[in-house]
Amino acid sequence: MVRDTRNVDLERGLELCKPEKVNKQNLFTNIVKPQKDKINIKTDKIKFFLNNLFTEFSKFHDSCYPDGRISTRSKLRWPLLIIWCILIVFAIDKNFEVKDFLSIWINESFINENRFYSEIWGPIAIYICLFILLLLGLIYCSKIVVKAIPLISIVIAAVVVIIAVAMVKILYICHWLIYKILILAFGIKVKPLGDTLPTHNGETGSHSKATVGSDIEQIEFQNMPTPVKK
């Protein structure tokens, strides 16, 4: 009996595609791991870039300002900002190859016929544009921060006032509730303090103005002589 071999490859492929036949280790090695490695490489590159950037700026800053302070009235603040921008531009180009990418794009798009001039002026134009954009961005951000400082202080003061008023109100409400609970639940009556009068046995007691007359009458009644029975 002759076996039909036309569908052998199809059957074998379907057999290999079954879930129990899939090799998870090969799937991870061939698909997941390369993508994960690419992400890790990009992350390490960004970390390395930031580390180099702040290291270079720290060296420059420490050499210009040993005490660690930058005065806003110093005449060197603008040169410092310009040098800071130049360091950022070169650090970005060193780690992410911005110049090479833009140079290729400029050469292929605009000036293929003048390659000599494009190789000279292309990178210079790219650096100048990046520098200007970065400088304008830093200046704009500094203006926003300066304008936001008074607003932030006003907001903080308003929040503090609101918290203080709320605390006073809460204390007043708690005092009122405790007073009402003592009166209603336990029947405690708070009497106002009045004058002190001597009692019949020589002791002093606290009396209010409303009970002064009745106490005097009671004392006189107790001191009256008792009648003698005949």
Swiss-Prot record:
Keyword presence, Ribosomal protein: no
UniProt GO cellular component terms: fungal-type vacuole; membrane
Broad class of where this protein is predominantly found: other
Name of this chain's protein: UPF0494 membrane protein C1348.07
UniProt keyword Cell inner membrane, yes or no: no
Taxonomic classification: Eukaryota, Fungi, Dikarya, Ascomycota, Taphrinomycotina
Cellular location(s): Vacuole; Membrane
Membrane topology label: Multi-pass membrane protein
UniProt xrefs under Pfam families: DUF999 (PF06198)
Keywords recorded for this protein, A-Z: Membrane, Transmembrane, Transmembrane helix, Vacuole
Transmembrane annotation, as ranges: 78-98, 120-140, 148-168
Family membership noted in the UniProt record: Belongs to the UPF0494 family.
